[in-house]
């Protein structure tokens, strides 16, 4: 049908010309609306009135199952369905009853077919609603929420026409209140402002009590409760767009509900061939968080189907990271737990003519739109014998595979289900020499564990068709796969292969090098798990891929550490200072608050002796304008001591380098307040401090247009600076690995596992927020 004819048809249905043109841009909607209109005209034998046309548009735009189009059009054309509430009920009914035949008696009862709502009934329902709210209505007049009255009337008269209810409400309110006065036309500023202020107070209180981030971002749990509205309820998988319904579906879902009791079940299924990274933190939060938000359970399932690349250290590290982020799996499972069942199902696929043994080499299978395998139509009995021979080790690696008979969404034909590998498995030993692929294993393991929501990243969308196909081909419970966007960071690589290259070339020490964005690296650097979870909450769950700046993650880290990391003082590049008139014979004990903003969190004690050490940068013989720290004629305060020091003599070595300073001190309250107070240490511990910068110079080190030489050419050679002889106050003497501190004026630091008795090692986690007043 020509576009002009379609435009004329759509406007004749009651659509505005603009709406009709917008509809024409959507080919699927246009085709469905044309078909609905054609069928309606055949039923009516005449033109379609506007009311019927609008319902047909609503049907065409909202109906997912096109098999039901004719059925519903017949009800609309015959006026058995003639209101929007009836259409909504009809669409919900066919969505909830995906199998034929439809029970028309039950359908008509659920959709209000034949129910007549008289004007008198509408009048009575509206009058009753107005009487319930009369006092408030008389006070607020036309500022009252009239939608409340319409909602209450509609609740009583489910099948009443909404327009008729609105007209009746308008008429009765006008009769009660009379015409609008000038005050009724004014905007409701004061009331709105009062409500907004109350909302702000409640929100602020919630943020404090729930420990959320300072910008009052919704927690991921709260977001997932919202996302839950978009997901199907357990057992209602068929309501998900694109879900494939077979004659066995409803019975399988019934059995599924009997097993799970309607419980939400998710899973986090990592491959144990590498360390988890920041993107996995989002997946962990999403899967565990969604289950928790809905009182469900989450499995930790290792996809251990590739024994060549799996190592015990990766299993341990993954379990540790899940626990570190604060989550406890309902059960830790392995794909290898189900190898026997997976093999039995593979045999069944062959018996059903849906899989075959193929001898094409790997390079022949690569790419899309490849030619069909010459072995695709080999006899089922032959494939059974050959698959058994594969299991018994009678083929070399790459000599035979088992392939499934389907074409995936991305055009890939007949994905491999099993391949030969003569590598012993870490759990099953040498029992198997054939191993299932991800495409074969993933959906069937989800089915075995009765997962309700299989949440995975967007790159698996092309595998959704094979996911549904395989479960349905075997007539087993089919979960719903839902894809979301990956989380990436600028100035980072997270690919396992590329991290291995970084380790192999010595660019980083290992998977937990603090310059990486693996979770073990972030933990070693000192990032608190709460900060990572808060960061995931800020990013949220979207379908689009998200690439974030590292400073946003660092802001979350500061928010947490500001409240949890006790203060200490450390000096990185020290300068010796001798106080010539020290006010005590030996030393003084200084009480320093662990958290200066909240002294109820306690104090720690540090010595203050005649010799102290300050940062070399806190002294200048010839200061530039605006320099506020120690200089000739410019005293400076020592934090927490109550004393001010003033320069008397500069001691230099043979090369002219300043070796020490001699100063005098006075009470801070005994004279003019100094321009600045600096940190210091006395009788300190020597320690090693590692200062980290970005590992890469460009935002997208893997982008060949930005970094033509490849990511290894983009390394920042100054990404690590080690201070071997830093000094720190004695309050940290008993610190353990991963303990965290704020070194005053320097940043947040964490104790590294390389620490040993006699020398602590600190990693700088993040710097402090920039102080514009510091010079």
Curated annotation (Swiss-Prot):
It comes from the Eukaryota. L-glutamine binds at residues 303, 438. Its EC number is 6.1.1.18. Glutamine--tRNA ligase. Plays a critical role in brain development. Belongs to the class-I aminoacyl-tRNA synthetase family. GO terms for cellular component: aminoacyl-tRNA synthetase multienzyme complex; cytoplasm; cytosol; mitochondrial matrix; protein-containing complex. Keywords: Acetylation, Aminoacyl-tRNA synthetase, ATP-binding, Cytoplasm, Disease variant, Epilepsy, Ligase, Nucleotide-binding, Phosphoprotein, Primary microcephaly, Protein biosynthesis. It is an enzyme of class 6 (ligase). GO terms for biological process: brain development; glutaminyl-tRNA aminoacylation; negative regulation of apoptotic signaling pathway; negative regulation of DNA-templated transcription; negative regulation of stress-activated MAPK cascade; tRNA aminoacylation for protein translation. It is found in: Cytoplasm, Cytosol; Cytoplasm. The modification N6-acetyllysine is found at residue 309. The modification Phosphoserine is found at residues 70, 495. A motif ('HIGH' region) lies at residues 270-280. A motif ('KMSKS' region) lies at residues 493-497. The modification N-acetylalanine is found at residue 2. The gene is QARS1. This is Glutamine--tRNA ligase. GO terms for molecular function: ATP binding; glutamine-tRNA ligase activity; protein kinase binding; protein kinase inhibitor activity. It catalyses: tRNA(Gln) + L-glutamine + ATP = L-glutaminyl-tRNA(Gln) + AMP + diphosphate. Monomer. Part of a multisubunit complex that groups tRNA ligases for Arg (RARS1), Asp (DARS1), Gln (QARS1), Ile (IARS1), Leu (LARS1), Lys (KARS1), Met (MARS1) the bifunctional ligase for Glu and Pro (EPRS1) and the auxiliary subunits AIMP1/p43, AIMP2/p38 and EEF1E1/p18. Interacts with RARS1. Part of a complex composed of RARS1, QARS1 and AIMP1. ATP binds at residues 271-273, 277-283, 457, 486-487, 494-496. Highly expressed in fetal cerebral cortex, particularly in the ventricular zone, inner subventricular zone, outer subventricular zone, and cortical plate. Gene3D superfamilies: 1.10.10.2420, Glutaminyl-tRNA synthetase, non-specific RNA binding region part 1, domain 1, HUPs, Ribosomal Protein L25, Chain P. It is linked to Microcephaly, progressive, with seizures and cerebral and cerebellar atrophy: A severe, autosomal recessive, neurodevelopmental and neurodegenerative disorder characterized by progressive microcephaly, severe seizures in infancy, atrophy of the cerebral cortex and cerebellar vermis, and mild atrophy of the cerebellar hemispheres, resulting in profoundly delayed development and hypotonia. PANTHER family: GLUTAMINE--TRNA LIGASE, GLUTAMINE-TRNA LIGASE. InterPro entries: aa-tRNA-synth_I_CS, Gln-tRNA-synth, Gln-tRNA-synth_Ib_RNA-bd_2, Gln-tRNA-synth_Ib_RNA-bd_N, Gln-tRNA-synth_Ib_RNA-bd_N_1, Gln-tRNA-synth_Ib_RNA-bd_N_2, Gln/Glu-tRNA_Ligase, Glu/Gln-tRNA-synth.
